[in-house]
């Protein structure tokens, strides 16, 4: 399908999908960066060692990399919307784990879940935003797809104060 055909074949609510995808992308990454400034507090409250905190970072990276390596094209097979939904569900689950945080392993698992959420969002939500953007707003879609996660990381880190 050519660019001209794509511009006329988008459903009427496609731009709304691009906006929803943008909000989802920024939200997932804001939620993932919000816990980082709290590591020192949790280290003191939970009695974590420096290596426990380091392992928390490793678990996040393991979550991201495992999804990108083994399920990076998941949204191509199952569709963008279900994969974006899974990314949001993992993001919510990660946040809920932080609410009841009581141990180092729980902190590490919460960060792993957030890593999975971010990886799913990186691939599927970015593609969803681009797919939904009309030709007139294609630059917007591509800009959000490439910078939305950075905006989310900034918002989350600043938001936690």
Which positions does each model-derived feature cover?
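Pair of pore-lining "gating" transmembrane helices in MFS-fold secondary transporters
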Residues: 11-44
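Small-residue-rich segments within alpha-helical transmembrane domains of MFS-like 12-TM solute carriers
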Residues: 29, 33, 99, 115-123, ...
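Small-residue (Gly/Pro/Ala) motifs that create kinks and tight helix-helix packing interfaces
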Residues: 39, 152-161
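Helix-breaking motifs and short loop linkers at transmembrane-helix boundaries and internal kinks
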Residues: 47, 79, 100-106
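Central cavity-lining transmembrane alpha-helices of secondary-active solute carriers
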Residues: 55-72, 122
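Structural signature of the two symmetry-related core transmembrane helices
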Residues: 82-97
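Paired small-residue
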Residues: 94, 105-114
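Cytoplasmic helix-loop-helix junction between adjacent transmembrane helices
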Residues: 112-148
């Amino acid at each position: 399908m050519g660019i001209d055909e794509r511009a006329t074949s988008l459903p009427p609510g496609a731009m709304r999908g691009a906006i929803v995808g943008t909000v989802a992308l920024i939200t997932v990454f804001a939620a993932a960066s919000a816990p980082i400034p709290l590591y020192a507090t949790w280290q003191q409250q939970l009695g974590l060692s420096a290596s426990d905190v380091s392992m928390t970072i490793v678990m996040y990276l393991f979550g991201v990399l495992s999804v990108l390596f083994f399920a990076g094209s998941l949204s191509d097979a199952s569709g963008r919307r279900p994969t974006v939904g899974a990314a949001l569900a993992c993001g919510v689950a990660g946040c809920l784990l932080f609410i009841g945080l009581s141990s180092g392993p729980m902190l590490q698992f919460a960060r792993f879940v957030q890593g999975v959420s971010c990886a799913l969002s990186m691939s599927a939500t970015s593609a969803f935003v681009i797919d939904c953007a009309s030709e007139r707003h294609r630059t917007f879609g591509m800009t959000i797809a490439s910078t939305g996660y950075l905006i989310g990381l900034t918002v989350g880190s600043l938001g936690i104060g």
